[in-house]
């Protein structure tokens, strides 16, 4: 494999919606798509389980996740960096 092929990992930015499990966070990634027939912009979302080795990301944080090898049955992503800290309520 060449160096260019190794770096083709997808990255997504989303909000942490659950941090209850050890070393795992659930991230909600929202995207906007145009309805095929009516043309209205619709919000679609997906949840991903991401590996958080140090447990540093908390509920409400915006983080970037990177695709990786399968780490468990449902975990194929790794939390790579903090984009924005959760605001105080």
Swiss-Prot record:
CDD domains attached to this UniProt entry: Ribosomal_uS17
Assigned GO CC terms: cytosolic small ribosomal subunit
GO MF annotation list: rRNA binding; structural constituent of ribosome
Domain of life: Bacteria
Coiled-coil parts of chain: none
Gene Ontology biological-process annotations: translation
Annotated InterPro entries: NA-bd_OB-fold, Ribosomal_uS17, Ribosomal_uS17_bact/chlr, Ribosomal_uS17_CS
Pfam families per record: Ribosomal_S17
Swiss-Prot/TrEMBL keywords: Ribonucleoprotein, Ribosomal protein, RNA-binding, rRNA-binding
Keyword rRNA-binding: yes
Keyword Glycoprotein attached: no
HAMAP family named in the record: Ribosomal_uS17_B (MF_01345_B)
Self-association and partners: Part of the 30S ribosomal subunit.
Function recorded in the entry: One of the primary rRNA binding proteins, it binds specifically to the 5'-end of 16S ribosomal RNA.
Similarity section: Belongs to the universal ribosomal protein uS17 family.
Name used for this protein in its record: Small ribosomal subunit protein uS17
């Amino acid at each position: 494999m060449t160096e260019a092929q190794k770096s083709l990992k997808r990255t997504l930015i989303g909000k942490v919606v659950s941090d209850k499990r050890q070393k795992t966070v659930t991230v909600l990634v929202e995207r906007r798509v145009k309805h095929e027939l009516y043309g209205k912009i619709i919000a679609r979302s997906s949840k991903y389980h991401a590996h958080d080795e140090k447990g540093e990301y908390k509920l409400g944080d915006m983080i970037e996740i990177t695709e990786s090898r399968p780490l468990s049955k449902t975990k194929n992503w790794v939390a790579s960096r903090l984009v924005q800290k959760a605001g105080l309520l």
